[in-house]
Amino acid sequence: MKILGIGNAIVDVICKVNDDFIIQNNLTKSTMKLFFDENEFKKLISNLKIEKTVSGGSVANSIVGISQLGDKAGFIGKVSDDEFGSKYEEGLKKENVEYFYSKKKEKLPTGTCLILVTPDSERTMCTFLGTAGKINENDVSSDAIKKSEIIFLEGYLWDEGEPKKAFDKAINNANKVAMSLSDQFCVDRHKPHFLNLVQNKLDITFANEQEITSLIDAKNFDEVINFSKQLKKLVVVTRGEKGAVAINGEEVVESGIQKNLKIVDLTGAGDLFAAGFLHGYVNKLLTKECLKKGTEMSSKVIQQIGARL
């Protein structure tokens, strides 16, 4: 297998809202908030008009994109034996992704992410992890990890105790490890651990500019470049309208964005960028071509509702 993803198995519920809704519900725009009270989460959804429901989860979105590009890909994530769990499995099988988990009856429902899209196409996420947050080391197949060229992990796995053990097992058995830092607040919650991972455990780090800047307390992007050079590992940073940059030792490669796009929803931009880049990487393309592939995938997904093509 080329790439095996391990992450939160979550169904995305997409709704359009105005900025007032974000403010009234004490949410921080363009970030992800975790909900631990299922009733509070249901109350938030109850008054909204649902635009679309689709299988999601950051790494899972990337893995689907990788499969769509023709690479053999798999995913490990935990769902419950309920309506959303069945929908989740079906969504992966439809995209030819090998799913290394069988849904079971659980006390908690399948994880759900409420994605609130504001008129500027930014997305604010509210997540109830449910069963997704209970993935543990017993759910992770050592054999599948060892047979994969790269495993791809998400920082969100650190938001619950049990997934951390699954995370460690994956890293200890992997040939190569790539990870997305996931979210600026996620970085802030786990900064010392993430910094250790980036410096000592990961082969490839994916981050946006805000995440990597927060991680190292950088005052400007030159500090990000210098930090990344010293790692002598691959660091890939998306910078919004400024494009993306990949740093690997002294090699610094930049890429622009595709212009004149009709942006509808930025939800899957980072996920699909990672998909395109990793596709290029495992097929041994030059770094510049990997960035180009990432930009192409990202540009496609932001012109539609939802994080999957």
Put a short name on every predicted segment:
Residues 100-105, 115-161:
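Conserved phosphate-binding/catalytic loop of the ribokinase/pfkB sugar-kinase fold
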Residues 73, 99, 177-178, 235:
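Hydrophobic beta-strand scaffold residues
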Residues 50-58, 103-107, 267-268:
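Active-site nucleophile and cofactor-binding loops and adjacent substrate-binding regions
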Residues 1-76, 86:
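Glycine-rich phosphate/adenosyl-contacting loop at the front of the ribokinase-like
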Residues 150-225, 242-244:
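Conserved beta-alpha-beta core of the PfkB/ribokinase-like small-molecule kinase fold
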Residues 3-9, 15, 23-30, 47, ...:
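Conserved phosphate-binding/catalytic region of the ribokinase-like
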Residues 144-146, 198-199, 229:
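A short, aliphatic-rich alpha-helical micro-motif
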Residues 91-108:
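A glycine-rich helix N-cap at a beta->alpha junction
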